[in-house]
Amino acid sequence: MAEKTDPTKEPRAVAVNVLKGGFGKSTTAINLARELADRNGRVLLVDLDDNGHTTFNLGYRDQYESDNHVQQVLLDDADPLENVVQVTDNLDLFPSHEDLEEVETNLKSAMASSQRLGRNIVDPLLGDTYSYIVVDTPANRGKLNDNALFATKNLIVPLRPESGWESGITQTNKRLIQEARQYFDLELLALVPTDLSERLDQDTRDRNLLYAINSRDELASFVPNFAHLSAADWEAIDAGDYTGDLPGIRHRASIDKAHRARKPLRDYDAECDQLGCYEELAQIVENGGVVR
């Protein structure tokens, strides 16, 4: 497959992060990375989440349970390229490992402990080897999360319409974004409503999530176009006159089935109507933010 690298695009790394589990981080990271690979040159997906969902969902359980390659690369300076596996023609994976808690502990006593991912993976590989690097992060604070934010300096936050989504974004902002910004520039690229399925003309969790992020000035500019709703759109929804696409990444059986098939969505169901959302996420990473 020919690489579709655009020399005008700036290589960029991005972390997919929210301080709450079960909010679609792995699904978002996998399909964002796959769309970046489809649109550009080579892309690296790094799984730093100790639960290993990204690694499992792409079929690399053996690497998760083998020698601790994450320890070897981040702390012992092993060659990261010797520990990546190929997912598709242009997409590689640096898998997670079952002993990431040990890596977390050892990082606490290491020199430059928050710079290891940047120094050993992102900085040497971004640009020359990979056009983009996507990092799936843990759902809790710690050195691995610090490494992901410091190395990428760009953040995408997925949100599911479940109880606790608001505390998830509040804690992510307070305990990750604002704290990190005391030490380095960290850009929030997008807030991504995902796995939506309910009606919007009734008092549902989907509606509450979409209304909150679209109506708050401090959040609205980070909402992708596929989830953006104007005041006029809400009036049309309540009047039963809305004719636009349903906003957000919608729940689709093929997304879940792709995980069970150990494939990104594009490689499992190239006709899925939600691929356009992941493609826009890729454009947001390419552009460095949402463009209305």
Residue ranges and their predicted role:
Residues 1-292:
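P-loop NTP-binding core
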